[in-house]
Amino acid sequence: MAQVNILRHNPIAIFSNPTEIIVKDDKNQVFRLVEPSGNVGTQYPNDLGSEWFGTIENLNNNLKTCGVEWSDVYKTDVLWTTPSTERDTCDQVKDDFNAIYAPMINSMTGCSINSNRMARFTHPEGFPDPVALFEVQIKAVRGENVSVNNGVIDYGYWQDHQPSGASVMHSRDGKTITSIGPNLAEEMAFVMFEHYEKPFAEAGVDFKKQTVWMEILVAVDDDPEKTWERIEIVRRAFEEYYGNDRPSGLIYPVSRIPNLDGIVEPQPRVVAGDVSIDRSGEIENGFATWTTITYGGITEVMTSAVGGIDAGVELLTLDSRIKEAGGKGLKEDGVFNNAYVVAGPSSQENRDRLKDFNTEFSGWYEGTAPAGRTAQYVGGIQQASYQSGISNRAIYCK
């Protein structure tokens, strides 16, 4: 009989850290999923190296709490506070961080890196900790029958593909191409086909049919006035590409993606093998409102980001969608929330909005241990009218 046990360690009003999920599937295979909340390293001086040292230290402690290590990490999100609207400044920060990224992990943990990675410059307002230069979120898995390699988690009878985010950057005739021109629909189509559909097809996976989640970043700092024009172009390209097989997910503006000449960076989650996919049949903001995958008697629910003006209402909507997908609810089955607070030009107003958001958020969870969480300031989420948004991943067995 399949079993799921969710352990929410060190809970506070807005998140637990880390969240540990111990799973036994109906094949009697046991594995654990570990999801620390987003971490910063501001216990050390305010420079890239010191904060990265502190972030690794914090995340490593989270992993050890759950009996796993850095070589078990399969997903890494790097979110940089935007240091400037100037391209060259962002390029330098990116290069400086990348120079210390892997060497410091290796030296501090003694582990190799098996994880994918998706990075972006989020917004000048940054994160709940106002001095943080970046925030990092990781996910890990360990089990006797589980292997992790380059973003692919192989459970033996099914595979969970979580590749790194990709832009239009590619090689041609020995040269690195970073842009294919101003047509965003063509840029999105190129990335989807060349970086995802084609290599998945070579591996025998139907990318369109088997994508269950999609996060889409749209860079806007080179021309902020076109923020929502760009998002709508990319959203339409996404809708046309997937048709009736729409995954759940989200789309939002970021300052810049790592390929500073590119605009679009999508990152999918794709499953293959002995795993079934179910979609809600309801489309909102271009995405299925929820998608489930079921393997070995275990079901995961991925709910698209719900936007609005009140975090409590957004959480209530997520709760109803998890129930609609067959789960007990967000408080019972939720393992991780990604929170997005829309920032404007006034830093004080942005900070006040975060306080309100957290009050609404903690009010909904009052009396229970919340799921893990990462929160970030963004220039928007899903639609221009939304002031905040939350997406969630939940797991249960019937």
What are these regions (language model features)?
Residues I216, A339-V341:
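Short tight loops/turns at secondary-structure junctions
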